[in-house]
Curated annotation (Swiss-Prot):
The active site is at residue 101. InterPro entries: Ferritin-like_SF (IPR009078), HSV_RIR2 (IPR034715), RNR-like (IPR012348), RNR_small (IPR033909), RNR_small_AS (IPR030475), RNR_small_fam (IPR000358). It holds the Pfam family Ribonuc_red_sm. It is found in: Host membrane. Its EC number is 1.17.4.1. PANTHER family: RIBONUCLEOSIDE-DIPHOSPHATE REDUCTASE SMALL CHAIN, RIBONUCLEOSIDE-DIPHOSPHATE REDUCTASE SUBUNIT M2. It comes from Equine herpesvirus 2 (strain 86/87). It catalyses: a 2'-deoxyribonucleoside 5'-diphosphate + [thioredoxin]-disulfide + H2O = a ribonucleoside 5'-diphosphate + [thioredoxin]-dithiol. This is Ribonucleoside-diphosphate reductase small subunit. One of its GO terms (cellular component) is host cell membrane. Fe cation 2 binds at residues 94, 157, 191, 194.
Amino acid sequence: MDFVKQFLYSCDHMGFLALTQETWQNRWFPSQISLTSDVACLQSLNPRDLEFYKFLFSFLAMAEKLVNFNIQALVADFHSHDLEHYYTEQEAMENIHGKVYANILNMFFKNNVGEMQKYAREIVGDEALAAKLHWLHGRVSEAKTRAEKVLVFLLIEGIFFISSFYSIATLRVRGLMNGVCMANDYISRDEWVHTRAAALLFNTLVPDEEKPSPEWIGALFREAVEVEYNFILAKGRGVSHVNVADINRFLEATADRILKSINVGPVYGTQPPPNCPLVYTGCLKNVNFFERESSDYTTAVDNDL
């Protein structure tokens, strides 16, 4: 690469420049999420619910690092100032997510870091989580072309956390954990922006001749949805307000929506459940009457999802 072009910035991708600016305008911080009122809500969770949410937040907290590792590997395959700038911002947002999850875990574990780390080590061996991670590791290892790497990354961003976000959002239906629900709103919206970015990367920087067939892509998405469904089927049994059938419908609808964004036809034709508790694209945005704050971004929002 030409030395000057490598080090002297000039706009080379309007799409990623726009996403970078959107990220700046929609930035939020861990200090904006108050968990003060959420502490008392822990007493309203039965033992099954409490264990489920401890598990989910421990998984999500560790997964943030996984996402950043994949970003660094992915960006190395492309050369674009604006793409690199955008993904630097995305890595920063993933770090914010990690800090918020750490705060939530401190609440669940009563600031006992030793117990938190011991629990995290234990759940890595959980059968449902191990199956999910095994599938992901296999797909990452098998992805040899840039197109395949981007598609796997797209699934990590768009499918890999959906059942967790959906399950956390059901706490709002129960009038519980306003702070946790607000954090979940912010993070799930951020992840949808990240999904859009991965789709933009696939559409604009991966040549058509490198892209797999629509049939191959559709089969990959079916695999991912099945893995995510099996995960929540195994972990969500008996948890209050967690409707696994509705989550599966939402997974299928989300997969179709992502496929459409990369110009591939739907594989399910499923509509999202009408009572979806998530507030980003594809669901109705609602503000619980009992919440102190709206789930909108605190700063001025551009292109609100």
